[in-house]
């Protein structure tokens, strides 16, 4: 799980009920194979994360100066009205594709299932014209999200809402090989048991969040990991949904290694979405902006 820094208010996790998927809605969602409406995000995807939209002009300049058009995850803060993000999302969408994170995993437990559904509807209604990908669940298998039944209910309901409006939906899983607290939360085991079959077939994107700092510095065999993920989600574009480190001496090496990684799995699209873009690459004069831009230029395509 990433380190939450800058203007984040503290908080943590949630409680129980699995939705009975309304038969008509489930059949519509599971059968839906049409291309989502809105802009098609080209591949490979060069992702970054913006967790604070202040200094908007500096953010958009850093984004627009990159060698290739990026895709920017905007983290929608907890208990914030979507109107707050209207101008930032519009301005960022002019220089970048946009992935909207409905709620960071750290705060999922603070929302009831009904509140999560309400939040999804509110953000979709306010920003659907400028958000290209909707991240309906973030680090969804993390032990800190609360009661599993509630987590699944939030994920599936948000997915159903997004797909009922023919928008692109993403789920981010948390890679935790040998560093999980509960065996049931191991990434593949949790996804197999808790992601419904219609979502396994219908998700537009499935991302992996991974922080080496969380897993004792483990460097997994990512080719094998993504090959296995592809089997579970055969129709989804796959890649990294979060990477990063808070260790200053490691940032440049991590950036270069992840963004230039060569993975040959079909439907692998990169992603990466460096969590600390707002802190590390804004303004454009920061050294790590140059490192990121060089890594994007060198990335396989």
Q: PLM features: what roles do these ranges have?
A:
Residues 3-6, 14-20:
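Sec-dependent signal peptide recognition
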Residues 19-27:
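Bacterial N-terminal signal peptides
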Residues 33-124, 128-143, 245, 273-274:
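N-terminal substrate-binding region of glycoside hydrolase catalytic domains
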Residues 57-60, 85, 113-123, 179-199, ...:
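Distinct, well-ordered alpha-helical segments
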Residues 88-93, 155-170, 175, 226-233:
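Surface-exposed amphipathic alpha-helices with a cationic face
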Residues 100, 132, 138, 173-175, ...:
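Aromatic- and acid-rich polysaccharide-binding/catalytic face
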Residues 110-136, 150-163, 184-202, 256-265:
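An active-site-proximal structural segment forming one wall of the substrate-binding cleft
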Residues 239-301:
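Substrate-binding cleft of secreted/luminal carbohydrate-active enzymes
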């Amino acid at each position: 799980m990433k380190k939450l820094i800058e203007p984040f208010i503290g908080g943590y996790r949630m409680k129980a009920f699995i939705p009975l998927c309304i038969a008509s809605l489930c059949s519509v969602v599971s059968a839906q194979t049409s291309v989502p409406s809105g802009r098609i995000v080209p591949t490979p995807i060069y992702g970054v994360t913006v967790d604070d939209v202040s200094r908007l002009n500096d953010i958009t300049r850093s984004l627009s100066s990159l060698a290739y058009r990026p895709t920017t995850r905007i983290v929608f803060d907890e208990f914030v009205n979507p109107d707050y993000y209207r101008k930032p999302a519009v301005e960022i969408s002019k220089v970048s594709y946009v992935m909207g994170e409905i709620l960071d995993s750290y705060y999922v437990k603070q929302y009831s299932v009904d509140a999560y559904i309400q939040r999804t509807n509110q953000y979709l209604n306010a920003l659907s014209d400028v958000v290209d990908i909707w991240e309906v669940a973030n680090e969804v298998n993390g032990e800190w999200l609360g009661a599993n039944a509630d987590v699944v209910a939030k994920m599936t309901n948000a997915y159903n809402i997004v797909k009922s409006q023919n928008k692109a939906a993403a789920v981010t899983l948390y890679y935790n090989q040998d560093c999980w607290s509960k065996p049931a939360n191991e990434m593949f085991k949790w996804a197999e048991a808790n992601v419904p079959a219609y979502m396994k077939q219908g998700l537009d994107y499935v991302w992996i969040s991974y922080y080496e700092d969380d897993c004792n510095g483990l460097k997994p065999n990512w080719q094998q990991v993504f090959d296995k993920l592809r089997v579970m989600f055969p129709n989804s574009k796959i890649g990294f949904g979060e990477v990063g480190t808070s260790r200053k001496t490691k940032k440049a090496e991590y950036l270069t290694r992840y963004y230039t990684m060569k993975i040959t799995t079909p439907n692998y699209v990169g992603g990466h979405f460096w969590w600390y873009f707002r802190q590390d690459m804004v303004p454009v004069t920061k050294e790590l902006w140059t490192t990121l831009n060089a890594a994007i230029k060198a990335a396989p395509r």
